[in-house]
UniProtKB/Swiss-Prot annotation:
Its main location: secreted. It is found in: Secreted. The lineage of its organism: Eukaryota, Metazoa, Chordata, Craniata, Vertebrata. It comes from Physalaemus nattereri. This is Nattererin-1. The keyword Glycoprotein does not apply. The keyword GTP-binding does not apply. Expressed by the skin glands. Keywords: Amphibian defense peptide, Antibiotic, Antimicrobial, Secreted.
């Protein structure tokens, strides 16, 4: 239902945000 969709969207957003934060604060070898 709608609640599950919202839950999944929130989960995806949290995962993306966590990934962005990790990328920001992790040294990136170039």
């Amino acid at each position: 239902g709608l609640k599950d969709m919202i839950k999944n969207l929130a989960k995806e957003a949290a995962v993306k945000l966590a990934g962005a934060v990790i990328n920001k604060f992790s040294p990136q070898p170039q």
